[in-house]
Amino acid sequence: MKLKALSIAVFAMLASAASQAQTAKINFTEYDLPNGLHVILHEDHSTPIVTTAVMYHVGSKNEDPQRTGFAHFFEHLLFEGSDNMGRGEYMKIIQAAGGQLNANTSQDRTYYYQTVPSNQLELTLWMESERMHYAKIDTIGLETQRKVVKEEKKQRYDNTPYGQLLNVVFENAFTTHPYRWSPIGKAQYIDEAKLSEFMDFYRTFYVPENAVLVIGGDINVAQTKEWVNKYFGGIPKGGKAIPRPTEVEPVQTAEKRVNFYDNVQLPAVILAYHVPPMKDNDYYAIQLLTQLLSQGKSSRFQKAIVDQQEKALAVGAFALQNEDPGVAMMFGIANSGVSPQDLETAMDAEVEKVMKNEISDEEYQKLINQAESDFVSQNQRSAGVVNNLATYYTFFKNTNLINTELEKYRSITKADLKRVAAKYFTKNNRLVVYYLPKSMEKK
């Protein structure tokens, strides 16, 4: 009994500590330069490292339909160097300084970041300012990166099982909005584009007023502000209005169904439901619902479809974080001998349960606990804090959401989950994709 009492006491103490960590405020300073660049500084001396990042408010949705893939191409192209930096030296310089770097592109934004020892902060600011205003964009760089992007497409999409999944969903779920193409775009358009088109895209979107610079970690705020002004203060505004897509996706009124054949061994079923943008309060409920269905061994899809019925080899569900109305996807890869129709029926049964019935108190508390755990995990390191600060400013214009968003999850009730599931997870609001082996295609 004493051992049990001790265990309970220890658990309570750990839970209390976790609760304090979850609610610990993340401090930051933010301001604008005269050229429109928004700057966010987060001071954290727990480790002698710093993360510098720039998020540009440009993604694949900003592209011309006849020039898809531009934003992703620029993710690569802007590592080519600059007027004051040798070609291909960007990565070498950061790695020589003991740092790491990367970049990624979504439908809504492009994100560059590097984490270095804190005594190398000034170096990263110089390099990001070079990327913003002095990038080397010429025929040599274009040809180099065309080859790189084509190879990436082969590896990640063409030669990967189910690699075309997102492309198929985007192309069929959307008819009007530019989410209808994926960030990788089409190699044909990148090949056809002229140097002048790339220069115009760069001068339009990779400008101070379309970016947020975030620096987090072991920094001296006063010194950092001086360096920010030194390297970014002299960069001029872009000089023209930044175009934003205005297309609105029509409301879907009937279920869509698509068969797609690829080099896979087992059929897969994808259910893609239209959902509101991440700014909408219902989006938080949708995140919790996808977590309920697929996150962990005790999730509903896992227990029912994989463990009990053995109809699926793998299952999953997630909602894309989109600035505009997007999709929440549920997928399953069928076990050998299981038809896609049977797998779809099993998935539908679990979806209908959350539409018609409130979840248990135990499940609900587990969802909230997981949201809190995810929040702590994302903000344990400077890189995670920096990414979140950039995201909250870019899409919400509310940087302090990093301290308040958790309350949005906590405010979702069991009734909200049932209501939101019933509203969005209807058959008329979805696309069903059967991702099938080529051997099943009728000749």
Regions found by a protein language model. Give the residues of each.
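M16 family metallopeptidases and their MPP-like homologs
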Residues: 42, 47-60, 69-73, 87-132, ...
